[in-house]
């Protein structure tokens, strides 16, 4: 497995680590998303402990309005985080 493929598998595994806790096994509830963000992205997303921030992120990600974040919706968050990280690397 290449380094990139290994990282992709890691993203899937982390998503599943949090998605299986409550409700549907392949989606994130707001509580599961908060736990994932505050644990895995604590140094990347500001104000992760602020409930209003989590509420806004969840609302923005939940494109279909089903009160769950599926893997495709979760990837929107990762894409945004990666774009910001990429821009910050070029600023340094």
Curated annotation (Swiss-Prot):
Keywords: Calcium, Cell membrane, Copper, Cytoplasm, Cytoskeleton, Immunity, Inflammatory response, Innate immunity, Membrane, Metal-binding, Repeat, Secreted, Zinc. Residues 38-53 are annotated as: Hinge domain. GO terms for cellular component: cytoplasm; cytoskeleton; extracellular exosome; plasma membrane. The hinge domain contributes significantly to its chemotactic properties. Cu cation binds at residues 16, 26, 86, 90. PROSITE patterns: EF_HAND_1, EF_HAND_2, S100_CABP. Zn(2+) binds at residues 16, 26, 86, 90. It is a peripheral membrane protein. Ca(2+) 2 binds at residues 62, 64, 66, 68, 73. Transmembrane segments: none annotated. Homodimer. Homooligomer (tetramer or hexamer) in the presence of calcium, zinc and copper ions. Interacts with AGER and both calcium and zinc are essential for the interaction. Interacts with CACYBP in a calcium-dependent manner. This is Protein S100-A12.
């Amino acid at each position: 497995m290449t380094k990139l493929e290994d990282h992709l598998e890691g993203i899937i595994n982390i998503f599943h680590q949090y998605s299986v806790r409550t409700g549907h096994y392949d989606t994130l509830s707001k509580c599961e998303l908060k736990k994932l963000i505050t644990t895995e992205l604590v140094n990347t997303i500001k104000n992760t402990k602020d409930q209003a921030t989590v509420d806004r992120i969840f609302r923005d990600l939940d494109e279909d309005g089903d009160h769950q974040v599926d893997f495709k919706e979760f990837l929107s968050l990762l894409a945004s985080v990666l774009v910001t990280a990429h821009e910050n690397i070029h600023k340094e």
